[in-house]
Every structure is written in C-alpha cells, then in structure tokens.
Amino acid sequence: GSVYAERLVFDGEGDAVEAMNQTMQELQASVLSAARTDSMNLDTEMSIDTAESDGSEEETLPQEADAAQPVYSMALTIDGDDAITYLDDHYVCVRADGYEYTGGAHGTPFRQYFVFDRETGARLSLSDVVENPVEELQTKVGAAFRELAEKTNFAFESPEDLEHTVADGISYESPFYLSETGVVFYYAPYEIASYAEGFPEVTIPYSELEMRIELSK
C-alpha cells in the first residue's frame, strides 16, 4: 500500500503565518497517522511520501510490499491556486482533497476546508463566520438542497424528505466553505446521494446571511 500527503505552506513571516502553517502541518500529520493505523488494521505494509505545496519531496519511507497483502492507498492533495476558494486581504479559504482506497470497486474521497483569519492565523468555524441562529441556517440550507433536488433529482430521498434530513442535520459544526458569492454547505459521497454525485453542495449568498466577518468581495 501507499500514502501520499501534501502540505500547503503559506509564505511570509509572523505569528499568523506560523499558526496557519501549523494547522496545515497538523492536517498532513493526521492523514499519515490515520493511514498507518488503517494499514496496520489491514495487515499491509506501505510506502509514505510527503510533499510541500511546491511539490518538493520532504520524506520518503519505502517498505517492501507483499503482493498477497490487501491493497491500500491514501492520498491528500492541495491543488495550488485551485485549492483557494476565497481570498481577500483578511481571510482565505483552502480546500484539501483526499482519497482512501481499501479495495473494491472504488475508494472513498474526502474533503476538508480551512477558513483562516489572515491577521491572527486562527481557523474559523461556522459560528465565527455567521450570526444567524442555527434554526435559520437549517431552514435556508434545507430549502436550498430541496430546490437542487427538484432540479436534478440527485438525492437518495425525495426533495421533500431531503429538505427535512438536511435541516435536521445542519449545525454550527456542519462542513462549509467560503466562495466568491456565499457560504457553501456540502456533503460527502454517500451521505445524501450516490458516489457518482460527488460532493453535493449549495451556496447561501452572503446577502442572505448575517455575517460576523467583513469580506471584501
């Protein structure tokens, strides 16, 4: 098996840059740790490669793999400019894409977003970004996914049932990211739709939200 994990490195100096780089380093370390644990559970050996965002090799730990062992691989990539979903003088949002394969027809993609305050280096949660009560967010996001389902019929459930499922699950801990036009809420494959649908998402425009932070765009 094998694991490959990239790490985005922010340029510059100061405590804020150091804090953001520390968060990204912790992400890389968590992926490597999870891969080691999974490979031990599968009783397979693996090679490990880690790289910074410029593609330079940072560490390589090759091991011999037995062809009879279970197939395992994990990758974490941060795709340069395409990984930046929002950027202004004060805030940045970064996407990290991952993929884990443990056998079968296909693996499991995963995705994380990191919203940073560039002045402090702090990673922001949804409650740091918006003031809306959870109940309002549940209504807005549920209705948006229902509208998407009515247009594309992408979900496991009917649009009406999907609206209730989404609304019941939305909280300040829900996965989200910042785009140029609004706050985006998303689900992983298989959560509300088939693997082929990827990461279903809806955008709630900034104009419809009570923002705690002032964005430049």
List PLM regions with ranges.
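Compositionally biased intrinsically disordered regions enriched in Thr/Gly
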Residues: 1-217
